[in-house]
Amino acid sequence: MLLKAELHCHIEGAASPALVKAQARKYGADISSFIRGGAYYWQDFTTFLLAYDQAASLFRTQEDYALLAETYLKELAAGGAIYSEFFTSPDHAERAGLSPQAYTDGLAEGMVQAKAATGIESRMIVTGVRHFGPEAVEKAARFAASCEHPLVTGFGMAGDERAGHPRDFAYAFDIAREAGLGISIHAGEFGGAESVEAALDHIRPSRIGHGVRAIENPDLVRRIADEGVVLEVCPVSNVVLKVFPEFARHPFPQLVAAGCRVTLNSDDPPHFHTSLAREYAVAAEYFGLDETTLNAITSTAIEAAFVDEKTRAALFARLKPVVES
């Protein structure tokens, strides 16, 4: 089996319909408006966000989040993944009445259990929500910087790309950077190339979540390649959410050809009827990537991972026999 690594997945968005159904039974909740026939049901980006939030609302305790992380990571490992980074949202935790620390500790419990069962290594990226404003993002950054949890190794920002300008959030990222956290920011998904450029100018990330609309500006693509910024690309998500109309129009092959460092990711997998394994299969089928190139993409993900060098070396040691075989 092809070994894989993922850098871009939202943990609340990774809850399978089966797990959400079990949580609904636990809390006596009605999920018929957003899960039908054992699958998530939504029609557009607005109703997707509603379904996402309704599913997330059914995780309310430290034990619930431990179960969520353990279940997802075991599923990921079964598909060949040896490493996972996922985005966490202190804002979702607080909406559920859980402190950010208890939320993080719960997720960490699940991560430890999944590693014991499968060997999968994983880390958390704390995220602020862009459309909640700079103060909320700074609050998330302060938590990330101060929690000192060994499995929290990055800070990022998700949410509505059209809300505010990256410069408004620069201070939050400075807080995280000074604490030694890796930096990633969502840009170039629903915002155009100018969104990616502004993120590079004002946030100075080592990675960009999505970033695919950089393709609209050839000079920007060259800059991304020259600076070695890693793009966390989510092809199935991009097509399902109509960022691009079909895989044949997705710029992944052009980004690779331009020398950009790219990775493959599932974003919110059950919502988009995907998985990390499917993302790799899509790249092979629609982008013409052979096994050597797919292994190189996994290597890029490990190179860009927010881990200590001992962990990185151990991940490469697992990947090396596969690459050489």
From Swiss-Prot:
CDD domains: ADA. Gene3D superfamilies: Metal-dependent hydrolases. One of its GO terms (biological process) is hypoxanthine salvage. Its cofactor is Zn(2+). The keyword Phosphoprotein does not apply. InterPro entries: A_deaminase_dom (IPR001365), ADE (IPR028892), Ado/ade_deaminase (IPR006330), Metal_Hydrolase (IPR032466). Binds 1 zinc ion per subunit. It comes from Chelativorans sp. (strain BNC1). It comes from the Bacteria. Its EC number is 3.5.4.2. It is an enzyme of class 3 (hydrolase). Zn(2+) binds at H8, H10, H186, D267. It catalyses: adenine + H2O + H(+) = hypoxanthine + NH4(+). One of its GO terms (molecular function) is adenine deaminase activity. Substrate binds at D268. This is Adenine deaminase. The active site is at E189 (proton donor). Catalyzes the hydrolytic deamination of adenine to hypoxanthine. Plays an important role in the purine salvage pathway and in nitrogen catabolism. The record marks H210 as: Important for catalytic activity. Belongs to the metallo-dependent hydrolases superfamily. Adenosine and AMP deaminases family. Adenine deaminase type 2 subfamily. Keywords: Hydrolase, Metal-binding, Nucleotide metabolism, Zinc.
